[in-house]
Design a protein with these regions (language model features):
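Short, acidic Gly/Pro/Ser/Thr-rich loop/turn segments
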Residues: 74-77, 154, 162-165
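Glycine-rich phosphate/diphosphate-binding loop of Rossmann-like nucleotide-binding domains
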Residues: 157-174
Length: 174
């Protein structure tokens, strides 16, 4: 979400060199937003330009993340901390671009920063959340769900429709 914390989270993550030692990381998005994320995070991350996701597998050196520059939203249309249609449409364009590449077999995985579902709905999302959008877009007809894993840590959703600031209130020991 261009108005949220995602760009700075990605900048902070990629400022740790071990991140790109574990995967061939390719960023897809607006160059101005990547620069802004780094500015907010107080870091500078070197990236190499890449023309398309179809070229991702041809990278022989993945020690630095690659950046595929696409124009999805004007900086003037993004207001930090505000859910707006322009930001939601931007997110959908980037996700759809990545899913198209996954369908072609050009990439193995998609990883994204926090999304604002309200902004996405304003921007054209026709589902309750991105998971259902993914399922329809990718033609999944069977059961699907989301689990996030990191080593032995597994997490799942509390709710798809609750702002992150309110999520703790939905948890209990039961």
């Amino acid at each position: 979400d261009p108005a949220g914390i995602g760009p700075e989270l990605i900048a902070r993550l990629l400022s740790q060199p071990e991140t790109t030692r574990q995967a061939n990381v390719v960023l897809v998005g607006d160059p101005w937003l990547w620069a802004e994320g780094q500015r907010v995070a107080g870091t500078r991350v070197e990236t190499v330009p890449l023309q398309s996701l179809d070229a991702a597998r041809t990278r022989t050196d993945s020690s630095h993340a690659a950046l595929i520059a696409i124009d999805t939203v004007r900086a003037a249309d993004v207001h930090r901390g505000k859910a707006e249609a322009a930001g939601g449409a931007s997110v959908l364009k980037v996700l759809d671009t990545c899913m198209d590449a996954a369908k072609r077999g050009a990439i193995d995985a998609i990883c994204f920063a926090p999304l604002n579902k309200y902004a996405m709905k304003q921007g054209g999302l026709e589902h309750e959340d991105e998971l259902h959008h993914f399922a329809e877009y990718l033609g999944v007809t069977g059961y699907f769900c989301e689990f996030n894993t990191l080593g032995s840590l597994w997490t799942s959703r509390v709710s798809s429709h609750v702002p992150l600031k309110d999520a703790a209130g939905y948890l209990s020991k039961d």
